[in-house]
């Protein structure tokens, strides 16, 4: 009988491999004071093995925890909690003999062998925790069959016999039909987690006559199996899990060799020497013993590194599996019979897995006596997590192949349901078939839902339903077909297919595909892709992480998406490349830079997303998702819906990458350097129509938190008749209402009669209300003229009588940022007056700057470098009434650094403004057009977290230069708001400050990794060209070192701060 003499100690099984001691203590600590938490870990990998022991101070607390927590979910997995138990006969040195056997059982190590009725699955042993707790290892059957190598059996199977037994005797002694009570396997303190009900071992001391062994190994021998013990005499509750019988007792004869201590030697007791039937199950023993090998016709070359046993499970090798998930297999290069061979002699131990039972046949593989490798590679971590799958190079009959060799869909589904798995590359041929050599994944007319290749390879659906898996590069040929040799996912007529690698999952990683791939549904055509013999990874690439998030995928080949008639709803390029829709529906994915040509077309060679007449298209890279990143696009792109025109983009041969994060949130669209147009019908778009001008409006129109990198062209929005419900500018540029409904983009709004309730500029530009309704988006700098008017050319927000207006960029929401405005801006409500600012014809950025994050939290507002007045009446401002003086800084013609630096975290929480270097017109300079470097460099990481951004060197209106060129903020914005991105440096002349039309080397070289290095370097250190200094300017330095310090006046390196003083700086 079993007793719980340590009721305060609990066994916790079935843990998620990510669960650690802290999580266990936090979860169970609510029931009472915990003395100790012991999580079993693999010695080699130091990863959790899926079970632990928690010792409470009070047995009552332990009992309550076991009652409440058993079966509950912890970190996504149902756990088992029970009190550890101890047998009535506690012994860590002796195992009672099997009753009626005439000899003592010697197999005290964990096995899954032993006689049992075929209706009872094997008991899967697992190593104990070094303290004798074997744990509940049979509760969740291990789904993956184990690959095997031939060779001598492991040394840790049992203690050596004193007399050599004949092979036949040993064969019978380990026969499958044996009915008996398994000997107790104890740990260091006598505890163990469970007791296999059916277990048999070899004789202990002397050879037993063949008849005796035959009786022991026979199927008719009743009896009880000894309990499996931990090293302190305790075990978990009985788990009555039967073991399937072996077909042929002669198929396996173990050579009795000691088990190596290199994995679990840390748990051995120095003075512990096993006696007779004693021995710990996976190397938790005091000393190793060398035993004489015994010949057998099914001998094994290498020691057993897993926890198998005769008959119940084939011995396996490689890193011991992490039960409950995380199994890792070593390479397999042979042929092995994974299922019963109907009495035929095989080269390896027949295995009956607990996954299914079908008339004594293996649920996974049945070879009709033919040699085949198991499905051991497949589904190695099918239900678990963090498994590592080593490469497989053999042939495997993973499904019922009628004697045909086939590798299972195990690769395609190595991490089918789990997370964090890793799938190594597969280079063989694979068939998963249930009948007639066809796959079990779809059992209809011998065809599979997932893969049927007619001899081709298939590794599709690598992380079909799971999350976090990684699909390493696939270099073979793969096909997916459902019926008639055609697949709802992929059919390539011999082409390769690795589509839909993470179709529904999250966080998967799809490595680059270098073969040909096609997807087709019926008639050789797919709802996703058909290329008429062209290469296609179709929606696989276009949608490698279609529904998930955080995936990343690179595409370097040619891809086609077509639905019917060679045309695709996603992409059709007439032989061109297509990698569109990379993360169309997902979130957080990363689309690596695309440098080829891509097209999207739906019908008639035209797509609702993109049609370029041979041009490139990578539009909609993160259309519906959030948080993804679209790396820089350097080709030409077009979007068109019908008649060569798209509701998103039509450029008459121009480039289009609009709508990069149209509906999503948090995505990033890296800088666009081409020309973009959007048009819906008749060459006109509800979003953008520019008559040949460029348009990148509405980049994040409906989403939130996305970023649209700088816009450098002309943009227009029009709906019908050249007019848009959002924008109408009579041919002028418009990027108003960028985040009218979402966050972060730019757009113009015009409602009716060419007038917009938000913006109407009578031909002027408008970028008003950039984040009017959204939250958290960012509006990149606007460099044109903008007006807002509601009726009669006047707007409830801004009217400037021809002046520019970017007022009220985020008046009502929180968290948005409005990038600096460098033109003229006025806010007026009625009669040309503004409730925020009216300057009597003077320039005004009104309260928009002052209120860029007025209502939100944590945002930063970039500085304004024009002349600004905030006044309510008589040219005076309610914010600061200084007689038309500037409220923040006024230097009477002197140069001054704006208070933008002084207020780097003026309104937000924890943000850091990088310092500004140069002379700035941020304050009132007496009307002088003094030189000024923009704050773009000062703000490379101004808004984001951990990102870097390289500078830009071209002519910019970023500072007031009296009509001269100055650098724009484009490079300053490459990763301006995001987190962790890295933008490669640019080499050219930097007009970042006003240099009198002279060229100036950018600071980009000093800052290519400027946040992680912390070096104070200016100029171009790679070329040794320092950045020229202007007379009267403060010393330049590396403002991106994250030191939080500013350079002292003396020009030293880090450590100092600017002094506050009159004329030079407000710090």
UniProtKB/Swiss-Prot annotation:
- Which stretches are transmembrane? none
Indicate yes or no for the key word Transmembrane: no
Stretches with biased composition (Basic and acidic residues): 285-304, 379-398, 417-450, 547-563, 816-825, 860-895, 995-1023, 1056-1067
Q: Polar residues: which segments have biased composition? A: 600-621, 788-809, 827-849
Does the record carry NAD as a key word?
Answer: no
Residue ranges of every copy of the RRM domain listed in the record = 8-86
| Single Gene Ontology MF annotation | snRNA binding
Annotated stretches, region: Disordered: 90-131, 144-175, 267-305, 357-1067
Pfam families (alphabetical): RRM_1
- State where composition is biased (Low complexity): 366-378, 400-416, 453-464, 530-546
User: Which GO terms of type biological process are on file?
Assistant: mRNA splicing, via spliceosome
Annotated PANTHER family: TRANSFORMER-2 SEX-DETERMINING PROTEIN-RELATED
Record protein name field: RNA-binding motif protein, X-linked-like-3
* Species: Homo sapiens
């Amino acid at each position: 009988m079993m007793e719980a003499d340590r009721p305060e100690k609990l066994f916790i099984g079935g843990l998620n491999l990510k669960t650690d001691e802290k999580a266990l203590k936090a979860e169970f600590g609510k029931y009472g004071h915990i003395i100790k938490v012991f999580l079993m870990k693999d010695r080699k990998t130091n990863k959790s093995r899926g079970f632990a022991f928690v010792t409470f101070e009070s047995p009552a607390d332990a009992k309550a925890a076991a009652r409440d927590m058993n079966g509950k979910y912890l970190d996504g997995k149902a756990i088992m909690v029970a009190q550890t138990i101890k047998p009535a006969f506690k012994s860590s040195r002796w195992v009672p003999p099997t009753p009626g056997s005439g000899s003592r059982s010697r197999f005290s190590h964990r096995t899954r062998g032993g006689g049992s009725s075929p209706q009872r699955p094997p008991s899967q042993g697992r190593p104990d925790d070094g303290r004798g707790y074997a744990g509940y290892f049979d509760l969740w059957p291990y789904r993956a069959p184990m690959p095997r190598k031939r060779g001598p059996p492991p040394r840790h199977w049992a203690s050596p016999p004193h007399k050599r037994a004949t092979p036949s005797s040993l064969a019978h002694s380990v026969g499958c039909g044996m009915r008996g009570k398994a000997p107790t396997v104890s740990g260091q303190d006598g505890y163990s987690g469970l007791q296999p009900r059916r277990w048999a071992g070899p004789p202990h001391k002397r050879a037993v006559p063949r008849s005796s062994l035959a009786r022991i190994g026979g199927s008719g021998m009743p009896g009880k199996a000894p309990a499996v013990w931990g090293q302190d005499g305790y075990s978990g509750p009985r788990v009555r899990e039967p073991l399937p019988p072996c077909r042929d007792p002669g198929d396996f004869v173990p050579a009795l060799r000691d088990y190596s201590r290199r994995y679990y030697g840390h748990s051995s007791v120095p003075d512990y020497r096993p006696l007779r039937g004693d021995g710990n199950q996976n190397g938790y023993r005091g000393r190793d013993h060398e035993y004489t090998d015994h010949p057998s016709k099914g001998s094994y070359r290498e020691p057993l590194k897993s926890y198998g046993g005769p008959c119940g499970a084939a011995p396996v090798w490689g890193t011991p599996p992490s039960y409950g998930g995380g199994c890792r297999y070593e390479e397999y290069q042979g042929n092995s019979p994974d299922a019963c061979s109907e009495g035929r002699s095989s080269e390896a131990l027949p295995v009956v897995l607990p996954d299914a039972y079908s008339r004594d046949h293996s649920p996974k593989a049945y070879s009709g006596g033919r040699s085949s490798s198991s499905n051991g590679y497949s589904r190695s971590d099918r239900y678990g997590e963090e498994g590592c799958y080593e490469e497989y190079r053999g042939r495997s009959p993973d499904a019922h192949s009628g004697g045909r060799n086939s590798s299972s869909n195990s690769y395609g589904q190595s991490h089918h349901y789990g997370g964090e798995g890793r799938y190594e590359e597969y280079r063989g041929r694979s068939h998963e078939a249930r009948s007639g050599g066809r796959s079990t994944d779809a059992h209809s007319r011998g065809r599979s839902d997932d893969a049927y290749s007619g001899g081709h390879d298939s590794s599709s659906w690598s992380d079909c339903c799971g999350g976090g898996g990684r699909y390493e590069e696939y270099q073979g040929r793969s096909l997916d077909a459902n019926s008639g040799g055609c697949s709802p996912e992929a059919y390539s007529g011999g082409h390769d297919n690795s589509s839909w690698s993470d179709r529904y999952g999250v966080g998967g990683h799809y490595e680059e595909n270098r073969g040909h791939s096609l997807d087709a549904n019926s008639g050789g055509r797919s709802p996703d892709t058909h290329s008429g013999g062209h290469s296609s990874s179709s929606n696989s690439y276009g949608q490698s992480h279609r529904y998930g998030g955080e995936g990343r995928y690179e595409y370097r080949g040619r891809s086609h998406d077509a639905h019917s008639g060679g045309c695709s709803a996603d992409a059709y390029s007439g032989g061109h490349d297509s990698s569109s829709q990379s993360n169309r529906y997902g979130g957080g994915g990363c689309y690596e830079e695309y440098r080829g040509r891509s097209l999207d077309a739906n019908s008639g060679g035209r797509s609702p997303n993109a049609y370029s007449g041979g041009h490139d298209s990578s539009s909609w890279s993160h259309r519906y998702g959030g948080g993804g990143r679209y790396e820089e696009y350097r080709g030409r792109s077009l979007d068109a819906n019908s008649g060569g025109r798209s509701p998103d983009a039509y450029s008459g041969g121009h480039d289009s990458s609009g709508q990069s994060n149209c509906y999503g949130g948090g995505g990033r669209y890296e800088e666009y350097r081409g020309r973009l147009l959007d048009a819906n019908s008749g060459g006109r778009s509800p979003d953008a129509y520019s008559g040949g001008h460029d348009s990148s409006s509405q980049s994040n129109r409906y989403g939130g938190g996305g970023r649209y990198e700088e816009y450098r062209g002309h943009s227009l929005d029009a709906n019908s008749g050249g007019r848009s419900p959002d924008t109408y500018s009579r041919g002028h540029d418009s990027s108003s209402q960028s985040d009218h409904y979402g966050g972060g983009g730019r757009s113009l709004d015009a409602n009716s009669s060419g007038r917009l309730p938000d913006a109407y500029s009578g031909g002027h530009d408008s970028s008003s209300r950039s984040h009017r309704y959204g939250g958290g988006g960012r509006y990149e700098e606007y460099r044109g003229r903008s007006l807002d008017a509601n009726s009669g050319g006047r707007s409830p927000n801004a009217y400037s009588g021809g002046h520019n207006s970017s007022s009220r960029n985020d008046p009502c929401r929180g968290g948005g940022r409005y990038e600096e405005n460098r033109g003229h801006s006025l806010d007026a409500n009625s009669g040309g007056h503004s409730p925020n600012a009216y300057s009597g014809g003077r320039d005004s950025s009104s309260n928009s700057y002052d209120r860029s994050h007025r209502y939100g939290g944590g945002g930063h507002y970039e500085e304004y470098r024009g002349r600004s007045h905030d006044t309510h009446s008589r040219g005076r401002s309610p914010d600061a009434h200084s007689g038309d003086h500037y409220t923040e800084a006024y230097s009477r013609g002197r140069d001054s650094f704006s208070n933008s630096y002084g207020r780097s975290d003026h309104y937000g929480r924890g943000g850091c403004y990088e310092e500004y270097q140069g002379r700035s017109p941020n304050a009132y300079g007496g009307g002088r057009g003094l030189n000024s470097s923009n704050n773009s460099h000062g703000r490379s990481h101004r808004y984001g977290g951990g990102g870097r951004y390289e500078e830009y060197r071209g002519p910019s209106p970023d500072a007031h230069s009296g009509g001269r060129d100055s650098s724009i903020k484009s490079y300053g914005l490459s990763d301006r708001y995001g987190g962790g991105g890295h933008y490669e440096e640019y080499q050219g002349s930097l007009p970042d400050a006003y240099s009198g039309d002279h060229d100036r080397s950018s600071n980009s070289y000093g800052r290519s990794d400027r946040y992680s290095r912390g070096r104070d370097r200016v100029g171009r250190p790679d070329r040794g060209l320092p950045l020229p200094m202007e007379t009267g300017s403060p010393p330049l330095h590396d403002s991106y070192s994250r030191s939080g310090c500013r350079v002292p006046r003396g020009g030293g390196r880090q450590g100092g701060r600017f002094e506050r003083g009159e004329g030079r700086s407000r710090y």
